[in-house]
């Protein structure tokens, strides 16, 4: 069993956490980067990173791929964590980074459901989970974006959802499906009554970004800041160690989608993210231009959105097979 890094290395990991919090990185990214830094240090017999370079990083990344069997995406995540450690925490110039071999991701087409399949999956889901999955599909949301929605982020009058701090720290506006608006309003009415009750019991405080909570100390207790899909019970915030109410855990919807896909008899590899892929593809099939879809998805580069043009419903790219002419 691997031993933990020495106190000096632990201080380095604490420094890494502090720098990431100063830069407003998400807690998930913080945990990931700290875990990769710890693994890197332990892999090299607890040597200090400032005494290592491209050779040690390449050896570590190769170990992950060959013995760990990780994907190219995971390798690149580890590399990003180590780059941050060297550049931002140790303040080490890294001209030798050109010598680090970056894993090349395989180009895979996204899995997409047909509209009939989307409906079949949604029909198998219980009401609350169906609403969340409906927003993943109807608004093109990532799972974390859906769970992070707060009451104030929905504009029923304009039919819009404001996605705050999406991937890459960007905000964007996407569509609120008209078909889901009444269901979402009903959900919020029920949620508001529940919030009033738990507030009277002193359990109405929601988790907030640290900077916002310092600026608006009353905000965690206000209705407009509450998560639309809150966790059933408050829990200890891993950063402040205070008891707050967070959003619903990701695994709740992931399990519900998995069960619904099985019940619907769909054999495709479907996850929560498949709804977002299907949203983009169906918009393109319905004639919306690529730039509009790019903005709704929040892609910084249109080339990322272009991948969906390869999975449009054209029946083998619209080609007539020679076998059909025999």
Task: Name these PLM-found stretches.
Residues 1-326:
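Conserved catalytic core of the tyrosine transesterase superfamily
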């Amino acid at each position: 069993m691997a031993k933990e890094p020495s106190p000096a290395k632990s201080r380095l990991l604490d420094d890494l956490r502090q720098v990431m919090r100063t830069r407003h990185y998400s807690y998930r990214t913080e945990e990931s980067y700290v875990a990769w830094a710890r693994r890197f240090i332990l892999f090299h017999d607890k040597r200090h990173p400032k005494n290592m370079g491209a050779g040690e990083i390449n050896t570590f990344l190769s170990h992950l791929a060959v013995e760990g069997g990780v994907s190219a995406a995971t390798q690149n995540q580890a590399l990003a964590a180590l780059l941050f450690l060297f550049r931002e925490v140790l303040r080490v110039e890294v001209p030798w980074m050109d010598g680090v071999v970056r894993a090349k991701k395989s180009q895979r087409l996204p899995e997409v459901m047909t509209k009939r399949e989307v409906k079949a999956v949604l029909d198998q889901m219980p009401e609350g989970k169906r609403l969340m999955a409906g927003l993943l599909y109807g608004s093109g949301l990532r799972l974390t974006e859906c769970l992070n929605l707060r009451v104030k982020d929905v504009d029923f009058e304009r039919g819009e959802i404001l996605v705050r701090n999406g991937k890459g720290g960007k905000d964007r506006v996407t569509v609120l499906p008209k078909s889901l608006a009444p269901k979402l309003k009903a959900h919020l009415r029920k949620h508001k009554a529940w919030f009033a009750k738990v507030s009277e019991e002193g359990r109405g405080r929601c988790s907030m970004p640290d900077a916002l909570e310092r600026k608006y100390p009353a905000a965690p207790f206000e209705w407009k800041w509450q998560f639309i899909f809150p966790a059933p019970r408050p829990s200890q915030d891993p950063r402040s160690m205070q008891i707050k109410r967070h959003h619903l855990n990701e695994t709740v919807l992931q399990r519900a989608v998995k069960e619904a896909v099985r019940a619907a008899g769909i054999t495709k590899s479907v996850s929560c993210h498949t709804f977002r892929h299907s949203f983009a593809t169906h918009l393109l099939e319905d004639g919306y231009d690529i730039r509009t879809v790019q903005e709704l998805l929040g892609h910084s580069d249109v080339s990322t959105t272009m991948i969906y043009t390869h999975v449009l419903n054209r029946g083998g790219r619209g080609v007539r097979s020679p076998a059909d002419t025999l």
